[in-house]
Amino acid sequence: MIRLLTVLLSVFILVGCSQGSVATTNTITDENTSEVMGTVTPQESHLLVEWNSDAMDRGNHDFNTMTHSELVVEPYNGKLQRGDVIYYQMLDSELEKNENLSKMYLGRVVGLPNETVKIKGGQVYINDEKLDAFYGVATSLGLTKEEYFETVNLKNINKEEMEHYFNTSMEPIKVEENTVFVLVDMWWRGTDSKDFGLLPEENIQGKVLGYKK
């Protein structure tokens, strides 16, 4: 009898562990979006944009046209996928809060219509599935929490503030039709959907294709 109970208990534990792992190991991956942006030859219909913020910086002054050439932007055609970097008109509500905020902004599409986005412990989840992408986790200059604290001189930073940043959390938000959820690549250096919620499709001006060749 004792042996039978032991076997049943073992099976119960194994099943419980298996079921628990399903909820934590399901992931959404992005194998199409490159972390490094290349150059493109602009066409007549394309926009050439200057961007002087470090909000998208992953360690190489990314997207910053003070270091790189102008950004080539394809006018919005109604088609977007996760990982796309878009050029959009900042929401009036944010401009009213900060008069120094740029009226035209960049952000990366993270959540699409009918998806639920949340952030827990610095990690983005889509419909409760971990977003396994370079832009799906809190970074600073492209460095993850572990990489950052191994690299920086702790005497030069506020460790408590950076710990808090790398553990950023946000309540779930359902992405409505005709909207997207956007994030900058260096969350603490820019304004995005963590601040203003969903971005209306009508605010999107275009998609960044690359640096001008």
Regions found by a protein language model. Name each.
Residues 112, 181-185:
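Active-site neighborhood of phospho(di)ester-bond hydrolases with catalytic His/Asp-centered motifs
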Residues 42-44, 117-122, 177:
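A short, compositionally biased
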Residues 76, 91, 122, 129, ...:
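Surface loops and adjacent helix of pleckstrin homology
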Residues 130-155:
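Acidic, glycine-rich loop-and-strand cores that form catalytic or ligand-binding grooves
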Residues 154-177:
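Alpha-helix-centered segments that form part of catalytic cores
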Residues 2-102, 170-172, 189-213:
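Protein maturation boundaries and topogenic segments
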Residues 70-73, 87, 118, 125, ...:
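Hydrophobic beta-strand signal
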Residues 102-133:
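Mid-length scaffold segments of soluble, non-membrane domains
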